[in-house]
Each structure stands twice: as structure tokens, then as C-alpha cells.
Regions:
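Short coil/turn segments that connect the beta-strands within blades of beta-propeller domains
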Residues: 82, 166, 228-229, 293-295, ...
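Short loop/turn segments immediately following beta-strands, especially the blade-tip
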Residues: 97-105, 181-190, 245-253, 310-319, ...
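Beta-rich catalytic cores
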Residues: 70-73, 90, 107, 154-157, ...
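Signature of short aromatic-glycine-proline-rich micro-motifs recurring in repeat-based ectodomains
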Residues: 61-79, 125-165, 209-226, 272-291, ...
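Short loop/turn segments immediately following the C-termini of beta-strands
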Residues: 89-90, 99, 173-174, 183, ...
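Blade-level signature of beta-propeller repeat domains, shared across WD40, Kelch, NHL, RCC1
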Residues: 370, 418-426, 457-491
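An edge-strand/N-cap motif at the start of beta-rich repeat modules
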Residues: 30-56, 77-79, 84, 463-464
């Protein structure tokens, strides 16, 4: 072979040779070109109150005694100016932030119902002995029975909160009363100046000497007004909602209207029969809301697993509601729209607690299903379906903290209770995308957007406060959630755990002393979460 031929063959082999380094470089290029899908972060609450972070769930952060930055079974929330109020049921107190918290777990400024932040006893530990004279029942078996005793500056199981005409009202549920301060309290343990439901601030007997009337209360829960004039109170264990047409001026001021009963002296669930449910009956109502612009009244009828809506504020006792949500009609009262306690669904409710309404729609805390439901428009038809669920990944889920025991996230809920909605209209440069469920069977979500060429309406800037009672915290949402997709095996829905089949959510361990012959909660019919 000539030298020229050998040279050509060598050049040909060199041209086809690829070094190991070059091969590695090509592999790296292939890897760089592969697109890694970005994980969509699930939207959750933006702020937590009562815990150091979103993962914590223990009452009083696991300590034996409370502090200025802890909560135990928080129930309701109120905001007035820059001030924030929370009813801390487990610690028998109301805590106040004089400046709205900006960081997780910020300490509060004031405490009502206790002398200081380390105290947590019901009525500050005051007790009395129940006998024939004090009970008014004439039952000798009650002689010597010890009960908690109220005084003017004590609180027992606080519930609803509202600032009305610049004055703070607190539903002191365990003392069967509503107390009012002459303004906004400025000192720890400051005493209120007026009481509803009792003759004076030292009494705490259920139904005011044992007689049901227009001025008595029995474990009241929610309170609301929107016009600093009409006051509504959910009188839970009297199975009615009381309405005052004007601001009370003295202790024991009588209400003007009763909803859920035919008269002011009646107090039976569903007017005497659990199955006698109708548009004018109630069973353990817990939440109330009055929208002054539309004059609509909203009542959470917890024992009947529904929300009732009156299109105009009732002027007379016993007026029937116009719309029902959570049931297909006014004659139904089954949990989860008749599907039972085991199965959450889009159309039903299971022991709901509170309702709030604004320009952006309606929210209901569906406590037994560990979720909050959202309607983009206030319902106008019976059984109208919600558009979005908060706290769960789908309408069919109901486990506390999505089944992870002892650990929460910014997106989960456990026993959600009272709520507060604050709205402010503001112009935004970009369109805020609002996640809404599709109507298909896969429960996929889509984004409601404005088509090109259309003018974008001002999007609501809001804060939704949720008293997440089971997680001993209050969470604040400022965006509607876009639930992340989770792969889930087809498995049977597990029944919610109940401690006492006969105890309602928000109910108390005290016996009902005034209806011995009444079976208010038949076994297995009204379980508590």
C-alpha cells in the first residue's frame, strides 16, 4: 500500500472517531434539554394566629398554661379598625390584638375574662352550690351540686364577637348571656357594663330563672349586625334566633322577634319533633349573618345540617325562610344531604357552624366535614351547589387535616368554626384568576378568566379569617385556593370519629335541666365530631 493510500485511510478513521469526553458532553446536552415540570404550589392561608407556624396543632402550643400567644379551641373572630378579637373558648377568655398581627404567632395585647394571660379557669374558678332555691326546679336530687358562678368580669366558654356602634359585645355562652362593654376595653380583665339574657352581671342561670322568654338565653352562640341597629343572636339550645330591632339600653333588654319558634315562650327543636323539619323550624342554630344591603338574613341550622336564608329581615316571630342550602328542600334534614355522616359531598353539609357573606359571595364553615365551602354568588335556589372547597382537595373528602394526625399545613383544617370576611375593592394591573370547579365527574378545576377585549372588573381584595378550632389557631386567607392534584387510591370513606353520639358540635357537657322528657339527640342521629 502506498503512503498516500495509508494517509487517506488514517484520515477516514479519525473522522469517525468520537472521544469519551465528547460522548459525555452529548449526554449532558440531552439532560439539559429535558423539561422538568414545575410543581404547582398549593395556595393556603397567609397568616396563622395562636401557633408558631402552620404545622403546629397543640392547644396552648403544648403547654399546661396559656400565654399571650396561644389559643385553645378558638371559636369566633372580630376585627375593628386595626384591632383583632378572638374568643378563646378553652381558656375562657377573649384575647385582643391592639395592632393587627403581621407575622405568625404574634402575641396579643389584652385579655378579658381573666386577670392575666396565664389564667384559664372558667369564671376565674368561682363556684356555687345548686339547691332548690337557686335552681328553681324543686328537684332535691340537685341539692349540693356544684356549678360555676359568674361575676361581672368573668367569662365561660365565649363564642360570638361583634363591635356594634363602637361597643364590644361578647356571647358568654357558658353563662347564658351576652355582655357588652361601654366601648372598646383597654385594660386586662375589664368588666362589661351591660348584659342580655340575665337580670344582672352576677347571674348565669340558663333561661333567666328557668323560664323561656324574650329576654332569656340558653347556650347562645353567634351574634351579628351590619347596621349598628338590628342585633341577631343564635340562641342555640332554645333552638331559635332572637332579633333586637334596636340597640339595648339596659340589662335584660327583651328581644323583638324569634325565628324557629311560634312564640317567645317556646324552645323545642324543630318545634317539638326532630322529624318535623320545615322552613320555619330550627335545631341548634349556631351562626347568624345580616346583610344590610340586601336585607337578607342567614342562619346556620346546625342540627338540621343546613343554612337558611330569609330574603328580607323578618318583622314577626315565626316567619319562614325563603331558601335552604345543604338540603334539597325544607323537609330534609339528613347529614350530607342524606348520604350520611360517612360521606362528604358537594351538595350536603355535616354540622355546619358559621356563615359569612360579602360582595364576592358566601362562605360556610362545614365543621363536621373539616372544610369551608364557597359560593361565588349568594344562593337563590334550594340546594344550590357551592363552587369551591377550602381545607380539602375535593368535595368528597372530610378528614381532619386531610388524614395526617397531629400535623397541619396552611391548606388544611380541623373543626373549622367561626369566620370573618373583610373585603376591599381595588384595581389590579393583572387579572386575579379565581379557581372554580368544572362540572365534570373528575372534579378537576379550571380558572375563570376574562376573554380578550373585555374590560376587567375590579377584583376583590379580601381576608377570610377561620377559627380552626381543632388546630388551636386562627388562619387568615387572602386568596381562594387552587387545590393541588393528589393521586388517591379508590378506598371506602372512613367514618368520622365521635366521642359522644349524643353531643352536638359546640354543645356542652351540661345537662339540659329544663326538658327532662325531651330526647334532643337520639342515639346515632346527631353525632358530634
Amino acid at each position: 500500500m502506498s503512503e498516500e493510500e495509508e494517509l487517506e485511510e488514517t484520515e477516514s478513521e479519525d473522522s469517525l472517531t468520537v472521544s469519551e469526553d465528547d460522548e459525555l458532553d452529548l449526554d449532558e446536552m440531552d439532560v439539559e434539554e429535558e423539561e422538568v415540570p414545575e410543581e404547582v404550589k398549593e395556595i393556603g392561608a397567609c397568616l396563622v394566629i395562636g401557633q408558631g407556624d402552620f404545622s403546629m396543632t397543640q392547644s396552648n402550643r403544648g403547654a399546661d398554661d396559656p400565654g399571650d400567644n396561644t389559643l385553645s379551641e378558638p371559636q369566633y373572630v372580630e376585627k375593628f379598625g386595626d384591632m383583632l378579637f378572638v374568643s378563646d373558648r378553652g381558656n375562657h377568655r377573649v384575647v385582643i390584638w391592639e395592632q393587627f398581627p403581621e407575622e405568625n404567632g404574634e402575641p396579643c395585647s389584652l385579655v378579658l375574662g381573666q386577670e392575666d394571660f396565664a389564667d384559664c379557669l372558667e369564671n376565674r374558678g368561682m363556684t356555687t352550690t345548686l339547691d332548690e332555691m337557686t335552681s328553681g326546679l324543686g328537684d332535691e336530687s340537685l341539692d349540693g351540686f356544684t356549678i360555676s358562678k359568674a361575676e361581672e368580669d368573668t367569662i365561660s366558654q365565649p363564642a360570638g364577637l361583634q363591635v356594634i356602634d363602637g361597643k364590644l359585645y361578647v356571647v358568654d355562652s357558658g353563662n347564658h348571656r351576652v355582655v357588652r362593654w361601654s366601648g372598646i376595653p383597654s385594660d386586662d380583665g375589664e368588666a362589661p357594663s351591660l348584659v342580655l339574657g340575665q337580670d344582672n352581671l352576677d347571674d348565669n342561670e340558663a333561661n333567666r330563672r328557668g323560664f323561656v322568654g324574650s329576654g332569656s338565653l340558653f347556650f347562645p352562640m353567634g351574634i351579628h349586625t351590619s347596621d349598628d341597629q338590628h342585633i341577631l343572636v343564635a340562641d342555640k339550645d332554645n333552638h331559635r334566633v332572637l332579633l333586637w330591632n334596636k340597640i339595648p339600653f339596659s340589662d335584660g333588654w327583651n328581644a323583638d322577634v324569634s325565628l324557629g319558634q311560634r312564640g317567645m315562650d317556646e324552645r323545642w327543636p324543630n318545634q317539638g319533633d326532630f322529624d318535623n323539619v320545615g322552613a320555619d323550624t330550627l335545631s341548634f342554630p349556631t351562626g347568624v349573618f345580616f346583610d344590610v344591603e340586601s336585607e337578607k338574613v342567614f342562619v346556620v341550622d346546625q342540627g338540621n345540617h343546613r343554612v337558611l336564608i330569609w330574603n328580607k329581615i323578618p318583622r314577626e316571630t315565626g316567619v319562614a325562610a325563603d331558601v335552604v342550602v345543604g338540603q334539597k328542600d325544607f323537609l330534609s334534614r339528613g347529614p350530607n344531604s342524606g348520604q350520611g355522616a360517612k360521606r362528604a359531598c358537594q351538595e350536603g353539609l355535616y354540622f355546619p357552624t358559621d356563615v359569612v357573606v360579602g360582595e364576592m359571595g358566601m362562605f360556610v364553615s362545614d365543621t363536621g366535614n373539616n372544610r369551608v365551602l364557597y359560593w361565588k354568588e349568594v344562593p337563590t335556589e334550594n340546594g344550590q351547589l357551592p363552587d369551591l372547597v377550602i381545607g380539602q382537595t375535593s368535595f368528597n373528602d372530610n378528614k381532619a387535616n386531610r388524614g395526617v394526625e397531629g400535623e397541619a399545613t396552611a391548606s388544611t383544617l380541623d373543626d373549622p368554626f367561626g369566620m370573618l370576611l373583610i373585603e376591599e375593592e381595588e384595581e389590579e394591573e393583572g387579572l386575579r384568576e379565581i379557581p372554580m370547579p368544572d362540572d365534570d365527574e373528575d372534579d378537576e378545576t379550571s380558572l375563570a378568566t376574562v376573554e380578550e377585549g373585555e374590560e376587567e372588573e375590579p377584583q376583590p381584595s379580601f381576608k377570610l379569617f377561620i377559627a380552626d378550632r381543632g388546630n388551636a389557631r386562627v388562619v387568615v386567607w387572602d386568596q381562594l385556593p387552587y387545590p393541588k392534584e393528589e393521586d388517591k387510591a379508590d378506598e371506602e370513606f372512613e367514618e368520622l370519629q365521635v366521642d359522644d353520639e349524643n353531643l352536638l358540635i359546640g354543645d356542652d357537657d351540661e345537662d339540659d335541666l329544663f326538658d327532662d322528657d325531651e330526647d334532643e339527640a337520639p342515639p346515632g342521629e346527631l353525632p358530634s365530631v
